[in-house]
Amino acid sequence: MTVSSGDPDVHASRSAQLFERADLVIPGGVNSPVRAFHSVGGTPRFIKEASGYTLTDVDGNDYVDLICSWGPMILGHAHPAVVEAVQKAAATGLSFGAPTEGEIELAEEIVGRVAPVEKVRLVNSGTEATMSAVRLARGFTGRTKVLKFSGCYHGHVDALLADAGSGLATFGLPTSPGVTGAQAEDTIVVPYNDLDAVAQAFAANEGRIACVITEAAAGNMGAVAPQPGFNEGLRKLTSDNGALLIMDEVMTGFRVSSAGWFGLDGVAGDLYTFGKVMSGGLPAAAFGGRADVMAHLAPAGPVYQAGTLSGNPVAVAAGLASLRAADQGVYDALERNSATLRTLLSDALTAESVPHRVQTAGTMLSVFFSEDPVTNYAEAKAAQTWRFPAFFHGLLSRGVYPPPSAFEAWFVSAAMDDRAFSIIADALPHAAKAAAAAVQP
């Protein structure tokens, strides 16, 4: 494997050695593509441990974590309440293949927070949640077509990979080989934040669209919030046309508020998908919604879905502990920390006259190297993304770990304190200078 010469000391590092070793037995050396640093160059850091806001790699380097495991760690890493819950659950058994009381408690916690969700099914990943929600929408409506938005990522479900964000955006791929033409034909893709395009799609496919699936606020083309009235417009268009509205809150759920994005705009979906925060950092996710729709799910109804490890007791314990520890003080801290980071980023880039927009979607944020606001995927791709690798490494080399992609949201945790922001503030001038000096290829 070739290691980027722009990554200093990499040939001598333990991370580099592990990356070489991993590449022999793991495709690309990683188990999720964005971790490979392909879009920013250099060698991925292999992490040994984490605590609070700090990641420590196998070479002993510490980083302020602005990835938070891609969203779940709102409390910070190794939070005592979550660790204790996991240890206690693991001591009584790792998996039973039978129901537990904890599953009911986690479902009750979700239903109690998000009013439109009346029943919930636990699964193992956000991909499983969106796949199952779409299948249920098709089964409930008797229709086949799904409408999604360019740049919105809903996991690696075949039907939902068309023009998706996240890793596909990072690698510049419109879709994935292996997705059949028949699957693609049932997926309608329109620009995000464009209600006219949605209305036209319904008119052109009258009586055939089962559901519209949208990120409640986009985080996989960077942080792009819905424009005022957009989610409300989706609610009306789906209702008027007999389709279901699936709100994908895998990223926003229980991060942007205790009730997710629903807690911010109050727009009710028919189905919801959750993951990340509700997992406490372990493999767990969920989908849920209206009771009459969920009644079509097996064993109550004919739409099949199952999972050997769904509702795993250790993952359930982590999720419950994380949600219960996330009191209003945690959400207030997330708001403050997101606002502070946004100001630091903008001030540093402004000082170097770098064109930029630091955009937020709730407490998620991202940096676009653009003079203009970004409201959709086309505008995100039109930004000067070639500046991002230099900016990224300027931060990483000084102890700050942002997402290794221009198209991923940045995340803060409630564990961040003055010292964390001091490290970020010290690193940003160098990173901003590097972004300013970057040359378009």
From Swiss-Prot:
Gene3D superfamilies: Aspartate Aminotransferase, domain 1, Type I PLP-dependent aspartate aminotransferase-like (Major domain). Pathway: Porphyrin-containing compound metabolism; protoporphyrin-IX biosynthesis; 5-aminolevulinate from L-glutamyl-tRNA(Glu): step 2/2. It holds the Pfam family Aminotran_3. SUPFAM superfamilies: PLP-dependent transferases. It is found in: Cytoplasm. This is Glutamate-1-semialdehyde 2,1-aminomutase. The modification N6-(pyridoxal phosphate)lysine is found at residue 276. Homodimer. It is an enzyme of class 5 (isomerase). HAMAP family: HemL_aminotrans_3. GO terms for molecular function: glutamate-1-semialdehyde 2,1-aminomutase activity; pyridoxal phosphate binding; transaminase activity. Keywords: Cytoplasm, Isomerase, Porphyrin biosynthesis, Pyridoxal phosphate. Its EC number is 5.4.3.8. Its cofactor is pyridoxal 5'-phosphate. It catalyses: (S)-4-amino-5-oxopentanoate = 5-aminolevulinate. One of its GO terms (biological process) is protoporphyrinogen IX biosynthetic process. One of its GO terms (cellular component) is cytoplasm. Its main location: cytoplasm. It comes from Rhodococcus jostii (strain RHA1). Belongs to the class-III pyridoxal-phosphate-dependent aminotransferase family. HemL subfamily. The keyword Cytoplasm applies.
